[in-house]
Structure formats: C-alpha cells, structure tokens
Amino acid sequence: MSTNICSFKDRCVSILCCKFCKQVLSSRGMKAVLLADTEIDLFSTDIPPTNAVDFTGRCYFTKICKCKLKDIACLKCGNIVVYHVIVPCSSCLLSCNNRHFWMFHSQAVYDINRLDSTGVNVLLRGNLPEIEESTDEDVLNISAEECIR
C-alpha cells in the first residue's frame, strides 16, 4: 500500500460515545466505511478502547471476506458497540485501509469532533500522536470540555 494513494492524515479525529448510555469509548475515532461494503458507514480507531468495553460472544467470520471478528460491548450499558478485527484477511490488508482494527457501529455510537491543543481547530489524524497515554481522568476531561462546547 502506498501512503500517497491512501492517506488519512487530513481526516478529523472524533471522540466516540455510546448512544445508549453516553459513555466515552474512544478519543481517537475516525469516520470510515466498511471495506467489504462501502455503503456501510462506521467509525474506527487504531488503539483498543480501555476501561469502557469488553469482548462478548464468540468469534465469527464475515460473508464477504475472511476476516475473523469479535463483538465488543459497552461496560456501562452492555450494548454491542464495536467489533474487533482479530485476524484481517489478506484481501482487506492489501486494500486501501487505515490500519484500524476497532470498528464502531454508527448506529451505536455518536461522535464529537476533537479539538487540537489550541481548543479552536478540529484535530486532524496527521497531528494525532501515534500512541497517547490516557487515563480515565484524561478521557473524562476531554468529554466534559467537548460536551460544554
């Protein structure tokens, strides 16, 4: 994959929250489409959500490709809000993708644009650190600031 063809650096970063209970699930979300069916909108992230979700049920495979998936539920309300691509198939890995393997169902989450350090501009994926140290307190502070806006 060439980064010139598949660049996601200008995409907005979102805070993702559970629609059912408003629990903050991720502060590194990005709007995406399902590779196997581009009519399906969703959100994705590159880092697993912590202290907000957990695996549920058994692994399964899609009908369109051979990716191995597992559902993930919100710890606060128990609703399935995410699935994790545990083993991506070669077809999906070779296609233009963002290397995100945590996929949030658009009907189960809502997004809030995350602001950059100035608090004025929307944070873009290209300006997001590859790995962020976050604690529950950090996520709650982000959520409170964004909810007030």
Curated annotation (Swiss-Prot):
GO cellular component, one term: intracellular membrane-bounded organelle
Matching PANTHER family: PROTEIN FAM72A-RELATED
Annotated family: Belongs to the FAM72 family.
Protein name: Protein FAM72C
Species whose genome carries this gene: Homo sapiens
